[in-house]
Amino acid sequence: MIHKHETRELVAIEELVMSWIEAFKSLSYFGIFLALSIEFIPAEVVLPLAGYWVSKGDMTLAGVVLAGSLGGVAGPLTLYWIGRYGGRPFLERFGKYLFIKPEALDKSDNFFKKHGGFVAFSGRFLPGIRTLISIPCGIAKMNVWVFSLYTFIAMLPITFVYVYLGVKLGENWKAVGSILDQYMLPIGIAILALFLLYLLMKKRKKRTHSEQLSVFLKNKR
């Protein structure tokens, strides 16, 4: 249950965020980029509002989508670098108290080197995870260019949909977040399920190949 004082605090926070976003508007597309670069400013608010500005002719759809997508990479990159230069040393020193062994860190590194791009991509579609996923990518020292590319590829359609709906709903742009939230999680889960299926099939194919090679070598003797 949300008490009245908590409601007032939430309203105050929302008003503060909105005032910042309105201030960013004066910077045009660079303002959109900056707003998306700051992780605690929700993209679910910025992008539909920017779509509303597009509907009024203040900006263009293409410009907002590009600026928003680039900003959507800059923000995660900050967390990536925090994970890269602060996360691994911390876990190597204190991981034993969290029951995290060095071998587990090495396995994580290998996994992200092989599949980090897909993890960075699919994580953008999962509410609650999309912000945090950048940190383990950094801890595993995933290639920064690969991380940035996959994050950008994911942000392009996400940004477009939020902005486009903001354009269509106009003054009712605030409804965009609640409309899309119900779809983002199923999409993210579906993408992860396909990825796990791919890994399973790849592992099975590798095992079958090993068995065939073993039989071939055995018959050669």
Swiss-Prot record:
Q: Subcellular location, in the record's words? A: Cell membrane
Naming one, the record's GO cellular component terms include:
plasma membrane
Asked if the Swiss-Prot or TrEMBL record annotates the protein with the keyword Transcription, the reply is: no
Q: Which UniProt keywords apply?
A: Cell membrane, Membrane, Transmembrane, Transmembrane helix
Task: Report the sequence similarity comment from the record.
Answer: Belongs to the DedA family.
Q: What is this protein called?
A: Uncharacterized membrane protein YkoX
Q: What InterPro entries would the database entry show?
A: DedA_domain, VTT_dom
Q: Which residues cross the membrane?
A: 30-50, 62-82, 144-164, 179-199
Q: How does it sit in the membrane?
A: Multi-pass membrane protein
* Major subcellular site: membrane
Which superkingdom heads the taxonomic lineage of this protein's source? Bacteria
Q: Does the keyword Membrane apply?
A: yes
